[in-house]
């Protein structure tokens, strides 16, 4: 490990993933690769508030540390506050980490996080970096350029293999707690629901959101044609969205679930319908059939559903992948996907036989 170190020398490891919930979930196979070797080590996850939700449902993680990284503040919501950053350095310094492993996606720089760990006195600092890191990184990996790019689950494993950790199966890890399962059961009992379809219309960027009026039509027709209730989920800031999408036939749950309870609901859904957002990866981790309405923001080969029955809906446009958070030209990549196509994909997955996890992996 780390160029010849014995596992016993790596007692306290900081795992860093500073972007969103789905990105962190896609890195859990790499966390598992580390845990399988460092069975007794303390593994802490430094992540965004949403990323820490993944850490809390990953048995390989011992501690989560919330950090609002300025390098990920794409909407400029964080006030400039050097004191806040120095306090973050002190929090890490107090924990006396032996090593930090920094995970990033394509187009992200590992160097802001590397500098944070450098200031915190963490002696070993590893990441993949296209940029020259100087002494900010003690172990630098150069990711291989591939077209099309590999799935994001494999990117983290490429870094851990570079560091000497044996490969593991690229399966995401997400385990709801007992209280999450109980919360999901209460919601279903409250609404008299057993078998159901789950629709999650929100996304962290507007460029990845299928139009709400189209989702509303999808919900209405799925309920009519399948005879199943349709749960429409969303976060606290999405109550209006879920209510609008649910209409008079769906069950709006915007802001009514914790992430753990939401995860448990996804795990029980007959089929999940969503955008290219974290919910796609939650469904993949739990081996639930998923329809992903995929915007042209990112390569679908890299960010689409993984090892689960799925229908990946893509409308090709010349501007894809744009990597934009707001579409400046009319969302043709999404408006080009007809609601009937979404409905047909969901009904097709509903008609597929129920599969075990192993069977789902073989099909995918």
Where are these regions (language model features)?
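Catalytic machinery of carbohydrate-active enzymes
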Residues: 1-364
């Amino acid at each position: 490990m780390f160029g010849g170190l014995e596992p016993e020398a790596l007692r306290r490891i900081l795992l860093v993933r500073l972007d969103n919930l789905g990105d962190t979930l896609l890195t859990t196979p790499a966390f598992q690769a580390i845990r399988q070797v460092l069975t007794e080590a303390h593994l802490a996850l430094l992540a965004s508030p949403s990323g820490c939700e993944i850490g809390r449902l990953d048995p390989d993680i011992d501690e989560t540390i919330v950090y609002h990284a300025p390098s990920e503040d794409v909407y400029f919501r964080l006030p400039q506050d050097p004191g806040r950053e120095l306090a973050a350095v002190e929090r890490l310094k107090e924990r006396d980490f032996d090593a930090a492993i920094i995970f990033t996606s394509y187009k992200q720089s590992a160097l802001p996080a590397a500098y944070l760990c450098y200031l915190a006195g963490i002696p070993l600092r590893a990441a993949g970096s296209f940029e020259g890191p100087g002494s900010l990184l003690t172990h630098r990996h150069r990711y291989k350029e591939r077209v099309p790019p590999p799935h994001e689950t494999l990117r983290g494993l490429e870094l851990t293999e570079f560091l000497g950790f044996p490969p593991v199966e690229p399966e995401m890890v997400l385990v709801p707690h007992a209280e999450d399962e109980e919360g999901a059961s209460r919601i279903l009992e409250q609404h008299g629901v057993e078998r159901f379809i789950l629709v999650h219309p929100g996304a962290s960027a507007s460029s990845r959101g299928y139009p709400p009026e189209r989702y509303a039509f999808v919900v209405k027709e799925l309920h009519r044609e399948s005879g199943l209730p349709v749960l429409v989920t969303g976060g606290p800031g999405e109550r209006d969205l879920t209510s609008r999408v649910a209409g008079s036939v769906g069950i709006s749950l915007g802001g009514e679930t914790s992430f753990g309870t939401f995860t448990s609901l996804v795990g029980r859904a007959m089929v999940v319908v969503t955008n290219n957002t974290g919910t796609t990866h939650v469904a993949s981790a739990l081996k639930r059939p998923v329809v992903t309405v995929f915007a042209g923001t990112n390569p679908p080969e890299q960010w689409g559903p993984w090892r689960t029955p799925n229908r990946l809906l893509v409308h090709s446009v010349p501007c894809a992948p744009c990597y934009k958070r707001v579409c400046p030209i009319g969302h043709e990549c999404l408006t080009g996907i007809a609601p009937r196509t979404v409905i047909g994909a969901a009904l097709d997955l509903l008609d597929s036989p129920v599969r075990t996890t192993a069977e789902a992996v073989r099909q995918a």
